[in-house]
Amino acid sequence: MKLADFVTYVFGSLLAGLVTLKVLSSFIPSLLVTLPAKVRLRVNNSLLKCSNNLNRIPVLDFGWKNSSVRRAFILASERPSDYTNKIYGDRVHIAYNDRIKRESFVNKLGFDSKRKLLGFFHPYCNAGGGGEKVLWKAVETSLNQDKNNICVIYTGDTDVNGSDILNSVRRRFEYDLDSDRIVFIFLQKRRLVESKSWPKFTLLGQAYGSIILSIEALTTLAPDYWIDTMGYPFAYPFVSLFARIPIVTYTHYPVISTDMLQKLKTMPGFHTNFKLIGKYVYWKIFMLAYKFSGLFVEIASTNSTWTYNHIKSIWSSTKNIHIIYPPCSTESLIEGCDKSDPVKRLNQAVVIAQFRPEKRHELILSSFSSFIDATTKKDLIPKIIFIGSTRNVEDREYVETLKKYAFEALKIPTHLVDFKTDCKYDDMKSILYSSWFGINAMWNEHFGIAVVEYMASGLIPLCHASAGPLYDIVVPWDSKKNEQSTDKANETGFFFIDETDPDFLAKDSSKYSSLRTLFAQVSKLNTVQRIDISNRAKMCSLSKFSDSEFERSWNEVLEELNLTHNRMFS
C-alpha cells in the first residue's frame, strides 16, 4: 500500500468513525426515553382485559423500547419501586396499585413529570462495607431533599431482592429508607467486572466489563443523572455521549494512580526487565484512558485529601471537584459511647476491615506475635478481635488462612485472637464500646471509615502512617476550641510504618515506630491518658465525619445538579 493510500485510509476511517459517533449520539438518547407509538392505547387495552381480575398481572414487551416504557411507568406510578426488573427481566409489567387507578396511570404516561431519576451505579450495593454506607446515605439524602426524587439502584446482587437489600441496610447502617421511591435494576453481567473473570490484562478486562455493564443498565432503564459511587470511569464516555446524561462521581480511590506507576518504576531491575517495562507502558496507556474519562464528569467528589490530590492531578480538566468525607454515623456512635463507662473498657483491640489481603491482617498478627514474645508483662497483652464482612468464597477461605497463620504458624494463644465474620451492627458496637484500641494496617488506605468508627466509639486508633488516616482522620484536635490543631500534645491516636511498605525507604523511620513497638507503647498508657486521647478523638470525629456533615455536602451536589439540569432544558 502506498503512503498516500494509507493516509487516505486512516483519515477515511477516522471520518467514518466520527460520523457514526455523531449519528449514534443523536439517535440513542431518544431511543432510551422516547415512548413507542400508541403506548397509552396498548397499556390501556391490557389493563381493560385484566379489569375483571386485578390479580392478573399484565406483562408487556416493547422490544428495544422496554427501557423507555419502564421509565414512563416509574414516572407515572403511585409506587415506583414496583418497576424493578427482578421478576420479569427486560419485559415490563403493570403494578397492582396502577392497575387499580388505570385511568390516572394511563393519562400520566409520556407527559412531563417533575420527578427525576437519580441512577446510582453500584454493582455491589449489598456488600455492607464503607463504600456501601456512602451509597445508602447518599440515597437517603437524595430522597429527603425532594419528594420528586426517585433513586434507581443498578446492582449485580441477583441472589437477593430489593427488600432483602433494604433490610440489610437497616440492620447494618440503621438507615430507614423510603422504599417506595427506590427502584432496583438487577444487572446480569456483573461477572464482567470481577477480577477473576480476567486472569490476564485484568484492568483492561474490567474496564471493558464496566462498559458492557453500564450499557446493560442504560438499556434497562435510563436515569436523569448517572451517579457512580463505586468507581467505573470507563463507562462515562458512553453514558455522556450516547445517553447525554450528566455524570456525578464519588471516588473512594483512583483506578490507577501515579503511586502505582512510581512503585513499578522503582522495582529492582526495572530498566532491564522487559516484562516490567511492558507493564509500565500498559499502565501508562491505561492512565491516559482514565484521564480521558474525566472529560465527561460534571461533578466529581472524593472521600479524602489523598484521593482528591490524585483525582485533581488525573482529571485536571474537571473543574468541579470536592472533598466529601464519608458518613460515619459518629452522632449515634458517640451517643452510645457516652452511655458506657470508659473505666470498664477491656484491654482489647479491634480490627474492622473486610477480609481481603490488602487490609494486611497478617501484618497485624505477625506484629502482635512479636510483641507477645518480647514483652515481659504478660498482663498488659491485649486481646485482638478481627471483625469484617466476607463477600464470597475467596474471602471466607482467606479467613481460614488467617486462623491457621495465627494459631498454627505463629502459635498465638487462641484466647488472645478472635475472628468475627459478617458481624451484626449492634454486636459490633458492643465490642467497640468495650474496647480500648482500634487498628488499621492498610497502606495508603484512601479514607478509613473504620478508623472514624473507632474514634467515635471512644477507641484509640493505631494506624498506618499514610493517606486518609494520616492526612484527614487521626489529626491533633484542640478540645477547648473544638478545631484541628498542630500541637502534637493534642494527639488523637498513633501511627506506625512497616518495612514491607512500598515506600518504606522514603519514610522517616525515626518519626514512626513499627506496630510491634506501638503495641508496647500504648499498653503502658494509664487510664487518664487513654480517656484524654479518647475524648479528643470523639470530638474530632463528630465535627468532621458526622452523617449530618455528609448530608450538607451531598445536598450541595444535588443543588449543583439541579442547576445544571435547568440550564440544559431551559
From Swiss-Prot:
BP GO annotations: protein N-linked glycosylation
Compartment(s): Endoplasmic reticulum membrane
Matches recorded under InterPro entries: ALG11, ALG11_N, Glyco_trans_1
UniProt key word Transmembrane: yes
One Gene Ontology term of the molecular function aspect: GDP-Man:Man3GlcNAc2-PP-Dol alpha-1,2-mannosyltransferase activity
Membrane topology note: Single-pass membrane protein
Residue spans, topological domain Lumenal: 1-7
Spans through the membrane: 8-70
Function: GDP-Man:Man(3)GlcNAc(2)-PP-Dol alpha-1,2-mannosyltransferase that operates in the biosynthetic pathway of dolichol-linked oligosaccharides, the glycan precursors employed in protein asparagine (N)-glycosylation. The assembly of dolichol-linked oligosaccharides begins on the cytosolic side of the endoplasmic reticulum membrane and finishes in its lumen. The sequential addition of sugars to dolichol pyrophosphate produces dolichol-linked oligosaccharides containing fourteen sugars, including two GlcNAcs, nine mannoses and three glucoses.
Protein name listed in UniProt: GDP-Man:Man(3)GlcNAc(2)-PP-Dol alpha-1,2-mannosyltransferase
